[in-house]
A protein has these predicted regions:
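Long, low-complexity, intrinsically disordered segments
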Residues: 2-3, 162
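Local sequence-structure signature of Cys/Sec-based thiol-disulfide redox active-site neighborhoods
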Residues: 17-47, 51-59
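Thiol/selenol-based redox catalytic cores and closely related redox-interacting motifs
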Residues: 56-164
Length: 164
């Protein structure tokens, strides 16, 4: 057994994923129409984890949850805003004078403004763009993985492909 006090590289997520260990809680704020989100979800499942999937356009997170996700991700609210295909410009959300409350109001009224996929694991919270970002939050993958477009991400031994 690894001593977490003396082994700085101990990986609690990988440890928990081993046979006989309790399941890992993973949440993905997901849009099934988004290829990046679908690839991220597939990588989570490739690690042997069935996450709690929140289709955030159908079931938007509360204002408090969005604020917490932004803080825990380190990206801040502006870092979680999606511009393309949203009312971002029409609402003037690029204005740096807007407060966090104003941004939260906009996200609550228009959940499409929340960028995706957001993933929560015991290792942290990340906006997984590109989708490979999720690998930093997961234990070793269960085998090879390629994105929908065929781009390899993980090799047959469950390791990230060089350059990814």
């Amino acid at each position: 057994m690894t001593d977490r006090m003396t082994d700085p590289v101990a990986d609690p997520v990988a440890d928990a994923n081993r046979a006989g260990a309790p399941p890992i809680d993973v949440v993905i704020y997901h849009n099934p129409d988004c290829g990046t989100s679908r690839n991220t979800l597939a990588m989570i499942r490739n690690a042997g984890i069935e996450p709690h999937v929140v289709e955030y356009l159908k079931t938007p997170p509360s204002r408090a949850m969005v604020a917490q996700l932004a803080a825990r991700s380190g990206a801040g609210l502006r870092g979680l805003l999606r511009e393309a295909g949203t009312p971002y410009a029409a609402l003037g959300l690029g204005d740096p004078a807007l407060t966090d409350d104003a941004l939260l109001d906009a996200i609550a009224a228009h959940p499409i403004l929340l960028n995706r996929p957001l993933v929560v694991t015991p290792k942290g919270v990340r906006l997984c763009r590109p989708s490979e970002t999720v690998l930093d939050l997961l234990p070793v993958q269960g085998g090879a993985f390629a994105k929908e477009d065929g781009a390899p991400v993980v090799d047959a031994d469950g390791r990230r492909v060089a350059g990814v």
